[in-house]
């Protein structure tokens, strides 16, 4: 289940995250390494090492077959509409990097990534090795589908792919991604969005509660949290589609579309 990487000595690189909160969450390292296949912003060392405080012992370029890069993870309307996921799709492939990290780092990563599901996958390293990895995938929500990422987010993927020397055709694909073109919201529109937060979250309570209760009945506490969050996201974007998109434009889908 957990693949063992060939770690370099770790003494020179502390896994202590910058904040005390992270330190308490990851107080000790078990020494057991996990190969984590990443394809999104965690390709970029400014995010993975800098923001998340991870210290990978190895980073191996590879391809995951049978999965496709998709921007189906809901973000913040009109600001950061969509994030990346690897979605199972026959005949597709997704390029990325297998990071060797400790079990504690992996558990911290999963906890902080929100509503992703964990799956075990087999990756083909560029050097010919077969790697058993763990990766994160996200369900496609009916009210969200897939949308364009922000330029900021797409740039993280592009820079990360170049940093790790990913396939040139893959980099060209990332360079060709359409990015979300933000719309200028007036003061009234901004106020309406802000005032809608509370009622929208209240409207999501029944669906989120039912989803959480169903998963809790199986004893899966983390799954219950994820299911509740996913249902909340779907309601939020349902409100966005029904009420705000006709007035302010569809966040994550440019006007020309």
Q: What is the predicted role of each segment?
A:
Residues 13-20, 24, 28-257:
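Glycine-aromatic micro-motifs
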Residues 1-12:
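N-terminal chloroplast transit peptides
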């Amino acid at each position: 289940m957990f693949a063992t990487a060939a770690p370099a000595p770790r003494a020179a690189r502390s896994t202590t995250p910058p904040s005390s909160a992270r330190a308490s969450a990851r107080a000790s390292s078990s020494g057991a390494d996990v190969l984590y296949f990443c394809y999104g912003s965690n390709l970029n060392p400014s995010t993975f090492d800098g923001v998340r405080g991870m210290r990978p012992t190895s980073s191996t370029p590879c391809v995951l077959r049978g999965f496709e890069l998709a921007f189906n993870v809901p973000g913040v309307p009109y600001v950061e509409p969509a994030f990346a996921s690897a979605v199972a799709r026959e005949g597709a492939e997704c390029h990325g990097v297998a990071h060797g990290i400790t079990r504690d780092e992996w558990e911290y990563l999963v906890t902080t990534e929100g509503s992703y599901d964990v799956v075990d996958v087999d990756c083909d390293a560029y050097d010919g090795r077969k790697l058993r990895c763990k990766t994160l995938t996200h369900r496609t929500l009916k009210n969200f589908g897939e949308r364009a990422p922000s330029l900021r987010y797409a740039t993280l993927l592009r820079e990360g792919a170049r940093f790790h020397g990913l396939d040139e055709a893959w980099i060209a694909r990332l360079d060709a991604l359409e990015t979300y073109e933000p719309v200028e919201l007036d003061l009234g529109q901004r106020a309406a969005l802000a005032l809608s937060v509370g009622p929208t979250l209240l409207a999501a309570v029944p669906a989120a509660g039912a989803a959480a209760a169903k998963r809790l009945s199986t004893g899966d506490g983390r799954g219950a949290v994820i299911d509740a969050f996913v249902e909340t996201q779907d309601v939020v974007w349902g409100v966005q589609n029904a009420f705000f998109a006709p007035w302010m434009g569809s966040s994550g889908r440019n006007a020309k579309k």
